Amino acid sequence: MVSNKLEQTFKFANDKNIERAERVLMQALVQDAVGVDLILTKLEPKDFFGFPFNFIFQTAQENYSEGNKLFGSALLEAVKFKLDTDSKTQREIEGLFEDVLLKGLPFLERDIKVFVDVVKKASIFRQLKQFAKKVEKEEFKVKDDRFEGYLQAIQNDFTKIIHSAFVSIPGLSYDEIVREEEELIPKVYRGELTVKGLKSGFYPLDQLTSGWKEGELIVVAARPGRGKTALLINFLQGAVNDSEKFDKNKDVLLFFSLEMRNREIYQRHLMLESQVNYTLTSRQRLANVYDDLIKASEVLRDLPIKIFDYSTITLDEIRAQITEVSKTNNVKLVVIDYLQLVNAFKNSYNISRQQEVTMISKSLKSFAKEFNVPIIAAAQLSRRIEERKDSRPILSDLRESGSIEQDADMVLFIHRVKDEDSENQEAIGHNNIFQVELILEKNRSGPTGKVQFDFQSDVSTFRVREYNPDGYS
């Protein structure tokens, strides 16, 4: 029989989910059920509330790390051996195995991950409570000359707790990777898969980038007033039109607008869809295009795009929003307009803005990998580049903005042809069409190059003129 001492293990919490979770995981471990590898790699002995579960788990994990997966009677004997000569405790462990772990509660394979998460979360909360008690207890005991060292020590302790909450991603063997690549290579050979990621809506650009790929950070940089927001909206349109990779019934695009209200973003998208700038159109002419506007509005109504407009937003808030939407939808693309308006923290700290922007770009890259989604972030360039003889943007123009240049997988610059050019000046005066170059200055996984566009600013529309792959003059 199981002793009263061991029964306390099952009654340690009011939350019956935690109690059941620990039991189920122990059962899976002892019975070598499907999912044991996840249990042994994600959890630690301290994640279980107390003896004997933590002791059983430690024994199993030590043998697992040495290449021996023990279960059933073999695991029981290993546990008893570690207990040495404590015969009373050995008998209690035997009773636990016989009465609970080798019989006990039924469970399904899909339950394992859920119960692992329950146990891990409960463990983190226990550790945080213990950490808080420790800090409170030491409040008046730390001497002034040791305060900085004390702060460093508690920061390290806190960081260890937080880091233990994250699951390590299992590595893939070459065999597993090759299986995926073997399916792709014939398609590439036949020309069926020139674009691996989500389409931008511009064929020449997709030929350079292979599309917006999962886990990548793409930065679109330009001086103020060069059409960054308009281009991002064009990218949204291109993504939702990608019928091969975007399912309007399941997928969603997220747009974080820090400069414009959500209504302004919608208006620009409506102008793009309808090709009508209704805010500047006379009432008489508007009557002629009214049906086009209504039709375009109906198209946009059904698009799975969520716009978050903030005057300021922190990294934690961006992550929280992506997490929340991911619970019910498949997030295919995240767009941020623009990067330098994001705050790393809710409160200001004693760090430079350059350091903060570095934290932001590194975190956005981390989010892209964590959520397995491409993130496109606009970035603003200083007007000082106009002082150069050749005002075409280059990568070093981003260096004053932290480590954007290093963190981004792709960097695209919007460069408007010199306004003093007579042809372009005439266009500016007549129909708001500007000649611009979209320069792919950095591409970690492919060629660089440029695509020439006509940018019709009054209806937020980019149209391809021509493109030049593999470099430019």
Curated annotation (Swiss-Prot):
One of its GO terms (biological process) is DNA replication, synthesis of primer. It holds the Pfam family DnaB_C. Gene3D superfamilies: DNAb Helicase, Chain A, P-loop containing nucleotide triphosphate hydrolases. Residues 191-469 form the SF4 helicase domain. GO terms for cellular component: cytosol; primosome complex. Its EC number is 5.6.2.3. It catalyses: Couples ATP hydrolysis with the unwinding of duplex DNA at the replication fork by translocating in the 5'-3' direction. This creates two antiparallel DNA single strands (ssDNA). The leading ssDNA polymer is the template for DNA polymerase III holoenzyme which synthesizes a continuous strand; ATP + H2O = ADP + phosphate + H(+). It comes from the Bacteria. ATP binds at A222, R223, P224, G225, R226, G227, K228, T229. InterPro entries: DNA_helicase_DnaB-like_C, DNA_helicase_N/primase_C, P-loop_NTPase. GO terms for molecular function: ATP binding; ATP hydrolysis activity; DNA binding; DNA helicase activity. SUPFAM superfamilies: P-loop containing nucleoside triphosphate hydrolases (SSF52540). Keywords: ATP-binding, DNA replication, DNA-binding, Helicase, Hydrolase, Isomerase, Nucleotide-binding, Primosome. Homohexamer. The main replicative DNA helicase, it participates in initiation and elongation during chromosome replication. Travels ahead of the DNA replisome, separating dsDNA into templates for DNA synthesis. A processive ATP-dependent 5'-3' DNA helicase it has DNA-dependent ATPase activity. Belongs to the helicase family. DnaB subfamily. This is Replicative DNA helicase DnaB. The gene is dnaB.
